Amino acid sequence: MPHNPPEGYTRITPYLLYEDAAAAIDFLTSAFGFTERMRMAGEGGQGVAHAELEYDGSPVMLGTPGGEFAGPASTGVDSPAFVHVYVDDIDAHHARAKEAGAEITREPEDQFYGDRTYGAKDPQGMSWYFAQHVREMSAEEMGPG
């Protein structure tokens, strides 16, 4: 009986749409430290129909918009969601992303819930939020909710 989800996948996996998926793959691997798992060429061998990246074993799928599906660059509207990624060294990750040209939307900052975080946008307008869990916090320590 096959595994569901397949091995190497999670039950929830972001699927991101980029006008230039090949450029997005290059940026996400160089700026944010993702690893490319696979890439399928589009019709006639052009562009990227589907690709899969991962960060520390967590997959992200991406492709080129088409039909009813559109990415933030094609709509002219900010991404209505963001991808949240835990990293091992938030400050080094921030420096790498900034050096690679990511638009930093929120500088690294300690949060009340025990994470140190920063926000960024990639060159095609996708929003990303990176975090490092730096201290354990109880619900009482975090305050009223």
Where do the model's predicted regions map?
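C-terminal catalytic core of tyrosine-transesterase DNA break-rejoin enzymes
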Residues: 124
